[in-house]
Regions:
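Domain-level signal for soluble alpha/beta catalytic cores
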Residues: 1-179, 185-301
Length: 301
């Protein structure tokens, strides 16, 4: 059994096979959010702050922080965003960038043990990211593609994941600090994408004994009622053994699916999390919770 321990300055979160699923809030990401990108580029992090607080209140146990803004000082923005987020919430963070300098900028100011997002099987990426993971004592997301791109063959993706785990070991990084992303593809374009991910998660768990992560909303791209489909997918992924995912926790359907799957899989001891989230609500409170969620989404749009 593999456990990945991540931390902020004051709180630990553990990814593990028999532990509650870890939802990672996705909203601190300027991609596709023009106003957020403009504000972050100009040094206004008020929306970052409100997004951070709202996601944790909604049930996110970690937050992903991305500062990818074209023609901007991404390392500088990343460092400021990490410091700001850590000042307003106490959950561990996932530092997310395709630029190595931005990853190191975030790591250099981070308090705790971060999850670095990400490394691939590409040689250049392996040799630039893994030394950072070791230097700062972080964990890392391993994405199952390499120099040849994303394979539709899950056996190829498995071998890429194995390669990354082995190369991490060469750098003194244990398999417990490698969290594999099996790559969720849009099911509207690739009909077998969901089944492939489930099969690959089971194999990663049984053979490599690593924790797993994904961008859950990728599965529903281009389809109607995306939240309903995302919730169905995440429930099945948890049943297959996935231990974390980057999601939008402001969508109540997603959080209900996650909490429910944890109960059904026996990973919510005595149903404590489910009871805390729902039983104590008085009549009508569930509707009010949904309305608050809608207001939070509108406020942070």
């Amino acid at each position: 059994m593999s456990e990945t321990v991540l931390s902020s300055a004051t709180r630990e979160v553990t990814l593990g096979f028999d532990r509650s699923f870890v939802p990672i809030g996705e909203r601190i990401n300027p991609t596709g959010r023009k106003l957020l990108a403009k504000e972050m580029k100009e040094g206004d992090f008020s929306r970052v702050e409100s997004d951070a607080v709202a996601q944790v209140e909604a049930g996110a146990r970690m937050l992903d922080v991305n500062a990818g803004i074209p023609l901007a000082d991404e390392p500088g923005i990343m460092a400021k965003a990490i410091q700001l987020v850590q000042s307003v919430v106490d959950v561990p963070l996932c530092i997310d960038s395709s630029i190595v300098a931005a990853l190191e900028a975030g790591l250099s100011v981070y308090k705790g043990k971060a999850l670095l997002n990400s490394v691939t099987g590409e040689e250049e990426r392996l040799e630039s990211v893994l030394p950072l993971v070791k230097k700062y004592g972080a964990a890392v997301v391993a994405i199952s593609n390499d120099d040849t791109g994303i394979s539709q063959d899950i056996n190829v993706r498995f071998e890429v994941a194995r390669k990354i785990v082995e190369r991490a070991a060469d750098h003194g990084i244990p398999a417990s600090d490698v969290v594999v992303d099996p790559l969720v593809m849009p099911i509207g374009a690739i009909g077998a994408a969901g089944r492939q991910v489930m099969d690959l998660v089971r194999r990663l768990r049984s053979e490599l004994k690593v924790n797993t992560i994904c961008g859950a909303s990728n599965v529903s791209f281009g389809l109607p009622n995306r939240n309903g489909l995302n919730g169905a997918f995440i429930s099945m992924a948890i049943a297959a053994g996935m231990t974390s995912a980057i999601v939008n926790p402001l969508h109540t359907e997603i959080m209900t699916a996650i909490r429910g799957a944890d109960v059904i899989m026996g990973n919510d001891k005595e149903c404590a999390n489910w009871i805390r989230a729902y039983r104590e609500l008085p009549a009508g409170a569930e509707d009010r919770r949904a309305r608050r969620g809608r207001r939070r989404r509108q406020a942070t749009a």
